[in-house]
């Protein structure tokens, strides 16, 4: 089992040093997990094609998200839905300050999506565009957004619980 003490020992630090910077193990894991976004954003840049409609982009965003989230469900659940997920915006800003090239190849809509700290803010930008295009009714946009996020949160949670028993093909 992983612990702050074990991480500190392996890194050559006293555990008190890590506790100075991180509240607990989940907080530390949130910061360490951000590197998983690099693979996700690179895949997203490859998967989003010029000329795609907004709805096609949105589907592709979630297909790509699911691909990576189902393979590392504990990490993705912790990042987007866990105890410290409200801090994700701060962590993402720091990450993209260090690795701005990870936003290359994305249009303005997707750059906005990738730099948001929570799923609601992230997806709202795309749903608002879908409303302006007439794909979703304005009065139904908020509930649509909440349902989409809740469904994906439950999928990632299920993947986390099932572990290796999860049939990835049927969930993607």
What feature does the model see in each segment?
Residues 59-98, 120:
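Helical hydrophobic small-molecule/effector-binding pocket
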Residues 10, 27-67, 71, 78:
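Alpha-helical structural segments
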Residues 6, 60, 64, 78, ...:
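Amphipathic alpha-helical interaction segments
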Residues 1-27, 31:
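Helix-turn-helix
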């Amino acid at each position: 089992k992983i612990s702050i003490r074990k991480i500190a020992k392996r890194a050559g630090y006293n555990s008190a040093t890590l506790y100075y910077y991180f509240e607990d193990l989940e907080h530390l894991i949130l910061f360490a997990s951000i590197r998983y976004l690099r693979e996700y954003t690179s895949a997203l840049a490859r998967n989003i094609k010029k000329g795609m409609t907004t709805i096609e982009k949105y589907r592709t965003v979630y297909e790509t998200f699911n691909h990576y989230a189902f393979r590392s469900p504990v990490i993705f659940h912790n990042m987007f839905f866990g105890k410290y997920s409200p801090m994700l915006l701060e962590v993402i800003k720091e990450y993209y300050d260090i690795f701005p090239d990870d936003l290359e190849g994305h249009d303005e809509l997707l750059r906005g999506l990738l730099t948001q700290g929570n799923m609601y803010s992230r997806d709202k930008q795309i749903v608002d565009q879908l409303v302006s295009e007439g794909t979703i009714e304005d009065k139904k946009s908020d509930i649509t957004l909440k349902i989409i996020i809740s469904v994906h949160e439950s999928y990632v949670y299920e993947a986390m619980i099932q572990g290796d028993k999860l049939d990835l093909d049927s969930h993607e």
